[in-house]
């Protein structure tokens, strides 16, 4: 299956109704009945903040697995799938788990788990199990708190794609990105945020701000822009400001 067949499994981990076990299932989304043999890690988070790491092993012909929990899960518990980031597949989230995972991103100290959650949440956005508005709101709360450069870059890309794919109101996104451009401690984060801001800016205020910046050739403090950045900015401005397009192109 791993080498010779296309696609990947759809995996879901659900706490049983009695709260005593975690039920993990896999299925072939292409309807061929294929099963993937692999070891998976799930993190059950309890209302008091305690966690339980649940290891699941799928055999060659195994579509589901039931693992008994050490503690009985109650209302408020949720599941973080693929906790070690080693699993292969689309980890479908229940609505309550998706909301909880999004809300817990800023407080998650484990960088591997945080990176895995970013991928899982983004894939659930693309598969429309998470509303774009909910995803964007939570990610914008999380992004300014991320200090890991790789995770920041990944999250920034996911947020930009969400804006482009689902055409959300850009106002809060523009505000958060500009705040990072002007206030982030890491210069690389400032530059990355500026480039994303440039690509998604749609409001008259944001476009006007970029036009003034380009015209004066004056980058925000602590944000070093290259000649290519100004060239790319001129292209975006020419599209956003058609009445000034000829002037912008000629000047650049």
Residue map of PLM features:
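Non-catalytic accessory/interaction domains
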Residues: 1-252
């Amino acid at each position: 299956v791993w080498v010779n067949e296309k696609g990947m499994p759809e995996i879901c981990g659900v706490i049983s109704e009695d709260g005593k076990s975690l039920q993990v299932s896999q299925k072939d989304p292409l309807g061929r009945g294929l099963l993937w043999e692999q070891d998976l890690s799930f993190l059950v988070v309890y209302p008091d903040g305690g966690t339980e790491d649940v290891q699941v092993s799928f055999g060659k012909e195994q579509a589901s697995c039931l693992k008994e929990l050490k503690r009985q899960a109650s209302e408020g518990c949720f599941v973080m799938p693929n906790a070690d980031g080693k699993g292969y597949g689309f980890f479908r989230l229940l609505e309550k788990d998706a909301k909880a995972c999004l809300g817990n991103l800023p407080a998650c100290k484990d960088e591997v788990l945080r990176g895995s959650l970013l991928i899982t949440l983004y894939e659930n956005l693309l598969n429309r199990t998470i509303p774009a508005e909910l995803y964007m709101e939570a990610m914008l709360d999380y992004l300014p708190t991320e200090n890991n450069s790789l995770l920041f870059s990944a999250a920034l890309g996911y947020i930009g794609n969400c804006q482009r794919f689902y055409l959300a109101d850009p106002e809060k996104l523009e505000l958060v990105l500009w705040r990072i451009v002007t206030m982030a401690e890491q210069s690389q984060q400032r530059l990355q945020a500026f480039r994303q801001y440039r690509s998604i800016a749609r409001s008259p205020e944001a476009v006007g701000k970029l036009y003034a910046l380009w015209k004066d050739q004056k980058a925000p403090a602590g944000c070093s822009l290259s000649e290519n950045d100004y060239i790319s900015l001129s292209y975006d401005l020419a599209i956003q400001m058609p009445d000034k397009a000829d002037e912008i192109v000629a000047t650049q």
